[in-house]
Regions:
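Short hydrophobic/aromatic-rich beta-strand segments that constitute the beta-sheet cores
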Residues: 164-170
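Broad, structure-driven detector of short, well-ordered beta-strand segments within folded domains
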Residues: 153-162, 198
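Short, surface-exposed coil-to-beta transition loops
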Residues: 151-154, 244
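Short consensus segments that form the blades of beta-propeller domains
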Residues: 143-149
Length: 255
């Protein structure tokens, strides 16, 4: 009887070769680098959109403040009982609170800086207010004095070159700071503003149609200014040159 012998075979364990492992590592690194690049790009895009959104918000806010203030310029609670707006409080002309002396009867008034960064250009608006009319100043407060005797409220706008901020200071003629909360103290309205330049629209006698815009030093009769053209320089959040925005606002209560 023949006996068949079976020789057991050695079992070989399956595994990765060095080449296969290197290929797998390479693919993994490519995927990792791709995910990292995508994350960085998304993060940079978010930051850019955030900076752009902040810039646009600052532009809208600054122009809203100035537009509302100029629209109120020259306002009287009762035109029949008022002939002029008195401007008896003259702010200093230091860099901390520029302004100059506003002529009586004017709803808007401005001073030029002459190119000196230490004495920024300013824009003033004035209106008569009663405690019951609800007019809000540029710092968010209203006149809290008499309900029958109007006071002159003045908003003074300028740019602080040390902080690149649009500032506003409110004065109430001869009544002190008690007549309006925070009056007399400069307040930051909008950040990221490096410069403000203002031109004033004049019209021929007997006309409301503006035919020229002039610098503040050229205006001789401030109560006849029909429009205000404001140019604001905003700090570019992406570097490079400032972003310039120009807006023209009609003076509603001009003579």
């Amino acid at each position: 009887m023949n006996t068949v012998r079976h020789t057991p075979r050695r079992s070989h364990q399956a595994g990765f070769t060095l080449v296969e492992m290197m290929v797998a590592v390479t693919i993994g690194l490519i995927v990792l680098f791709g995910m990292t690049a995508t994350f960085v790009n998304l993060k940079n895009t978010f930051r850019s959109q955030d900076k752009l959104g902040t810039l646009q918000d600052n532009e809208r806010l600054a122009l809203t403040f100035l537009t509302n203030s100029i629209n109120e310029a020259g306002y009287y609670p009762d035109p029949k009982s008022a002939s002029t707006i008195t401007a008896s409080v003259a702010p200093t002309t230091s860099p901390a609170s520029p302004g100059g002396t506003m002529p009586a009867g004017a709803g808007v008034f401005g001073t030029a800086d002459g190119g000196a960064a230490t004495s920024p250009e300013s824009l003033q608006t004035a209106y008569a207010s009663l405690s019951t009319d609800g007019l809000i100043s540029c710092i968010g407060t209203s006149y809290a004095g008499s309900a029958t005797v109007a006071a002159t409220v003045r908003n003074i706008y300028y740019v602080d070159p040390t902080t690149n901020s649009l500032m506003c200071r409110v004065l109430v003629n001869g009544l002190g700071t008690d007549a309006m909360a925070n009056a007399g103290t400069p307040q930051v309205l909008v950040t990221g503003v490096s410069k403000m330049a203002v031109m004033y629209g004049l019209a021929p006698a007997g006309s409301m149609q503006v035919n020229e815009y002039v610098s503040p030093g050229t205006v001789t009769a401030w109560n006849t200014v029909k429009a205000v053209r404001i140019t604001l320089n905003f700090v570019n959040p992406f570097g490079g040159a400032d972003i310039v925005r120009t807006h023209t606002i009609n003076v509603m209560n001009s003579n």
